[in-house]
Amino acid sequence: MYRVLLADDEQIERMALARRLMRRFGDILQISEATNGKEAVQLYEKEHSQIIIMDISMPELNGVEAAEKIRSMDEDCIIVFLTAYDEFSYAKRAIVIRAL
């Protein structure tokens, strides 16, 4: 069973992605959801998700900041950003922390 953490402040986006993942891989996934970056870090500390899929623009702690905190705890988890942001500074920071 793979533990997946979805972090996005838009509930409809989280629900749509969770639904697609469960439809395709439901028998091998356990999905948790966070509504902001701070909550994502807290859930990660509790559940140690192997795959984290998150938005960049979120309240309290943005996705890149949350990913940096998670990466400092776990060098091996997979971090993927799903975002409409096109600002290169976010992409550079994502590359530094080995996120996709």
Describe each model-derived feature in a short phrase.
Residues I31-K38:
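Conserved Asp/Asn-Gly motif in the active-site loop of CheY-like receiver
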Residues Y2-E13, L17-A18:
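Conserved acidic segment of CheY-like receiver
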Residues V41-L100:
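CheY-like receiver
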Residues F25-I31:
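A generic structural motif
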Residues A7-D8, A34, I52:
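Conserved sequence signature across two-component system core domains
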Residues Y2, L29, C77:
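Switch/coupling loops of ABC transporter nucleotide-binding domains
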Residues R20-R24, L43:
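Alpha-helical interaction/dimerization surfaces of two-component signaling modules
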